[in-house]
């Protein structure tokens, strides 16, 4: 496609107008090499109004996609199917650019290195950031929440993502981690020492309409109560991460 964007940034949101407006305001007037896609439930009129409000400020292409209250990872796959950028990445509602030239620097790195996938640096105000190097992929250490790779810092070539059939939606909470592991088994990422995204504190309750994250809402509401249901959900998360960790370490050469 002629004049197609270099990067498509995809935000999957649900009834989270305040945070969505924060992200859209951050990305308005960025490079024309960036496409911004918002995926929301078809009955989320508040988020649609936010998109309508900010779209006029965009120098780049922006589009909105309505889904039928599907799960968050299904919605992320839907966003990729409509993306026209050479590369894709995923930001949550509330995430922001660290600086006005962050994306320009990132795009220069993508164009010069032409990687299958890239990991940049992010600003995490709610935990210690993970420092990466090119010698080994780190971040799959259980029970150490500071050691992980956030999907907001991962940029993948769209054709690479498509060839892997997108996110594996069998996972309720760890499909993004599964995707990172799968990509790392094929080829190691290019590490770019570029601060791009300020990652907002997770707001799991904003996804209450999405079935694949329905259990997470329980955590956000009952986390301090120590209920058996919360502990059961913790076991789901732990089981998924242990499965991925074991699969990763067994196949690692």
Residue ranges and their predicted role:
Residues 5-8, 35, 178:
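Cell-envelope/extracellular polymer assembly enzymes that use nucleotide-activated donors
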Residues 10, 132-216:
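Conserved nucleotide-sugar donor-binding catalytic segment
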Residues 25-34:
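Short, acidic, metal-binding catalytic loop of nucleotide-sugar glycosyltransferases
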Residues 33-45, 65-66:
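Short beta-strand/loop segment that forms part of the nucleotide-sugar
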Residues 40-51, 92:
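A conserved acidic beta->alpha catalytic loop
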Residues 67-83:
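Glycine-rich, basic loop-to-helix element that forms the pyrophosphate-binding segment
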Residues 88:
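Short aromatic/hydrophobic "clamp" motif used to bind/position activated sugar donors
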Residues 100-131:
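Conserved donor NDP-sugar-binding/catalytic core segment of glycosyltransferases
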């Amino acid at each position: 496609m002629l004049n197609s964007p270099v990067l498509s940034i995809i935000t999957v949101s649900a009834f989270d107008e305040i945070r969505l407006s924060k992200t859209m305001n951050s990305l308005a007037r960025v490079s024309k090499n960036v496409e911004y896609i918002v995926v929301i439930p078809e009955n989320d009129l508040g988020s649609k109004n936010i998109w309508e409000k900010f779209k006029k400020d965009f120098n780049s292409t922006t589009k909105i996609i309505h889904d039928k209250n599907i799960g968050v990872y299904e919605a992320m796959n839907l966003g990729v199917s409509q993306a026209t950028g050479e590369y894709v990445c995923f930001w949550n509602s509330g995430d922001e650019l660290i600086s006005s030239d962050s994306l320009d620097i990132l795009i220069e790195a993508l164009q010069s290195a032409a990687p299958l996938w890239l990991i940049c640096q992010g600003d995490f105000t709610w935990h210690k950031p993970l420092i990466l190097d090119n010698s080994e992929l780190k971040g799959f250490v259980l029970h150490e929440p500071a050691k992980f790779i956030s999907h907001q810092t991962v940029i993948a070539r769209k054709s690479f993502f498509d060839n892997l059939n997108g996110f594996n939606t069998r996972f309720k909470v760890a499909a993004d981690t599964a995707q990172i592991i799968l990509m790392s088994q094929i080829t190691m990422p290019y590490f770019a020492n570029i601060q791009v995204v300020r990652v907002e504190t997770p707001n799991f309750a904003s996804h209450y309409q999405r079935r694949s994250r329905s259990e997470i809402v329980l955590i956000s509401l009952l986390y301090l109560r120590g209920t058996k249901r919360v502990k059961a959900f913790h076991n789901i998360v732990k089981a998924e991460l242990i499965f991925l960790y074991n699969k990763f370490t067994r196949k690692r050469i």
